[in-house]
Regions:
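Class I SAM-dependent transferase core
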Residues: 5-64, 109-110
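Conserved class I S-adenosyl-L-methionine
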Residues: 65-73
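Conserved SAM-binding loop of SAM-dependent methyltransferases across substrates and taxa
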Residues: 74-86
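Conserved SAM-binding motif I beta-strand of class I
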Residues: 89-94
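Short alpha-helix immediately C-terminal to the canonical SAM-binding loop
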Residues: 99-101
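Short, conserved SAM-binding/catalytic segment
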Residues: 104-114
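Conserved SAM-binding strand-loop segment of SAM-dependent methyltransferases
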Residues: 112-122
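Single conserved hydrophobic/aromatic residue that forms the stacking wall/gate
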Residues: 123-131
Length: 131
């Protein structure tokens, strides 16, 4: 099934604009993936559409407030949540500059004003809490 069919078969109530944003997002992943290795090269658009829907289901289970997507990669689930709930504040974190450059592009392309990105490496340090 393609994205529109998957959304129609689901319980999601997305506007035409949100469906268009989701479709553009998936197309941009495939386009950028040719040079930036965002996702597996074996993934097709219908695979990404299913992944989008899997991420969309999270929305129902989130409490109100901001969300941090650690190791976001190509933006799953952060960008998906930004499309579905454009008022929710989202911070996408990844250490790979190729991926964060894609995130900047897609945020601007889709007009996701509540989404911000961080390019950093997360690590743990010794602390009293760890002992």
């Amino acid at each position: 099934m393609d994205l529109k069919e998957l959304i129609a078969a689901s319980s999601l109530n997305l506007t035409d604009i949100q469906v268009s944003q989701a479709d553009k997002y998936l197309n941009q992943i495939l386009k950028w993936n040719k040079t930036r290795n965002l996702v597996s090269r074996n993934l097709r658009k219908n695979d990404l559409a299913e992944h989008f829907l899997d991420c969309a289901v999270l929305q129902k289970h989130l409490m109100p407030g901001s969300v941090i997507d650690l190791g976001t990669g190509s933006g799953f689930p952060g960008i998906c949540l930004g499309i579905i709930d454009p008022k929710r504040e989202l911070t996408l974190v990844d250490s790979n500059r190729k991926k964060t450059s894609f995130l900047i592009h897609i945020k601007n392309e889709l007009g996701l004003n509540s989404v911000s990105k961080k390019n950093c490496l997360l690590y743990t340090t010794d602390s009293a809490d760890d002992k």
